[in-house]
């Protein structure tokens, strides 16, 4: 009898461990991470042409360390990368008589004119985090006529590979952070919600161009059901 009870206990423990592990693996497989535009031209660290405040060495280090934590927890990590041709329509230098941050109409929409940034195959376009962290890097902004703040599509509606990659991994929830809160993080998070994903945005792993527009962007995200966490907290992420 004791032998039989012992075997029963062993099997119970076995199934608890195995099934519990499978459940954890399933949870990990259903959540992905999108790290938005951690590139030289957007950072103070590299004296980028479009550097955002707060993007110093400490920020890059913290972002890399937290991304490693997520990878070690079993979550697939995807990066977005601005990847513009030299003649991109969003560069003020490609519009005679225009200055940086002027606003023009482009294809019927307001277009902010930016300093030249993240030009293909230049150091400013390089991702500053360890490339081995990423399962895939999704390039955006390659069409010279359309800007692409979102990691899912450009302003003309042309899709990137992001949605396809996430669906291939059966992901239904994404954690989003990076540069900039009020532009590419915002657009990527909102498009993720529109595509049917649950979204969590990490505030302290993101940096915005301006405090007022960053707050407005976060308010907009919250209104769409996006959960905003101040810090990366694996337990809170699993619970949302």
Predicted regions and their residues:
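Bacterial N-terminal signal peptides that target proteins for export
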Residues: 1-11
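Histidine/lysine/aspartate-rich catalytic loop segments that bind and position anionic ligands
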Residues: 131-166
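Short, well-ordered secondary-structure micro-motifs
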Residues: 90-91, 148-151, 187, 212
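Short, composition-biased local secondary-structure segments
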Residues: 156-162, 182-195
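Residue-identity detector for glycine
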Residues: 6, 20-21
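Active-site acidic carboxylates
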Residues: 23-141, 168, 172, 193-200, ...
């Amino acid at each position: 009898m004791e032998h039989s009870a012992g075997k029963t206990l062993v099997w119970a423990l076995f199934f608890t461990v195995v099934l519990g592990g499978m459940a954890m693996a399933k949870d990990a497989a259903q959540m992905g991470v999108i790290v938005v535009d951690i590139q030289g031209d957007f950072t103070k660290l590299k004296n980028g042409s479009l550097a955002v405040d707060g993007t110093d060495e400490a920020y890059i280090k913290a972002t890399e360390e937290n991304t490693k934590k997520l990878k070690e927890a079993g979550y697939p990590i995807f990066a977005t990368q601005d990847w513009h041709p030299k003649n991109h329509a969003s560069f003020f230098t490609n519009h005679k008589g225009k200055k940086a941050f002027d606003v023009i109409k482009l294809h019927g929409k307001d277009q902010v004119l930016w300093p030249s940034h993240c030009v293909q195959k230049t150091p400013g376009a390089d991702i500053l985090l360890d490339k081995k962290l990423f399962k895939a890097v999704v390039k955006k902004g390659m069409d010279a006529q359309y800007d692409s703040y979102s990691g899912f599509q450009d302003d003309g509606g042309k899709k990137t590979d992001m949605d396809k990659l996430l669906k291939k991994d059966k992901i239904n929830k994404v954690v989003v952070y990076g540069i900039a809160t009020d532009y590419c993080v915002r657009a990527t998070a909102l498009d993720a919600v529109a595509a049917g994903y649950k979204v969590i945005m990490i505030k302290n792993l993101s940096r915005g161009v301006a405090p007022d527009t960053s707050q407005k962007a976060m308010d907009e995200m919250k209104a769409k059901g996006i959960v905003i966490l101040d810090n990366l907290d694996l337990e809170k992420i699993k619970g949302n």
